[in-house]
Amino acid sequence: MQTPYEYRAQAREALQGRWGEAAIVSLIILVTAVLISVPSIVAEWAGSLTTVLSVLVLPLQYAYYISLLERTRGSEEELTRFTLQYAINQAYANTRFLVAGLLIMLLSIVAAVFTFGIGGIIVKYMYIMVPYLLHDYPELTPREAMKLSREMMSGQKWELFVLDLTFIGWVLLSILTAGLGMLFVEPYMSTARAIFYKDLKEEKLIEETDETISTTAE
């Protein structure tokens, strides 16, 4: 595995010439999330409806993460087009992404409630590799992808957390731009995580064939 600064450098290289595209997708996801939250703002009783609808944003977010992953693999396709096409043709059409997102959200909420929020953070990092695994291994079910993510992140959650912490300066600076800076910081972080996934996959699964992975995840 590499240092956080090496991951950040590779993320910047992958996003070279694509920052604008990445920011546009971030904006699309942000606007979608805001629109979904409107019912709870208008009427207090609609809070539960907002929670349900927020699950529908997850496949779009997953499609975004995958577009950045493919960018690190050399894809030249425009990020906005890739994200929207993947969301429509894969993430929403294939219920695996929606089911996985729902399960992870429920586990995060339960863990957060009983551990004052700490458990929710742990669950987040435990299952953070799920969208990448569902993409790379179409034969995996949501449960199998979650199991494999747990195994991959065993002993690696702190390392990824530290990588995320190195972006704190950029996050704080984005406050000075009324949060607009996050449209660029978010893809920067997500691309670094995608590269982290690639390294972790190679390190943990290098001796595994796709057939073996499918079998052991059952």
Where are these regions (language model features)?
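Short regulatory "switch" loops immediately downstream of catalytic or recognition motifs
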Residues: 33-37, 71
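Juxtamembrane "helix-exit" motif on the non-cytosolic side of transmembrane helices
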Residues: 38-43
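Hydrophobic alpha-helical segments
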Residues: 24, 32, 75-77, 170, ...
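Selective recognition of hydrophobic, aromatic-rich stretches within alpha-helical transmembrane segments
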Residues: 44-78, 105-141, 171-206
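Interfacial aromatic "cap" segments that immediately flank transmembrane helices
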Residues: 2-33, 81-111, 123-175, 218
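Short, surface-exposed linear patches
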Residues: 37, 155-157, 206-207
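Cytosolic juxtamembrane C-terminal amphipathic helix followed by a basic/polar low-complexity tail immediately after
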Residues: 203-218
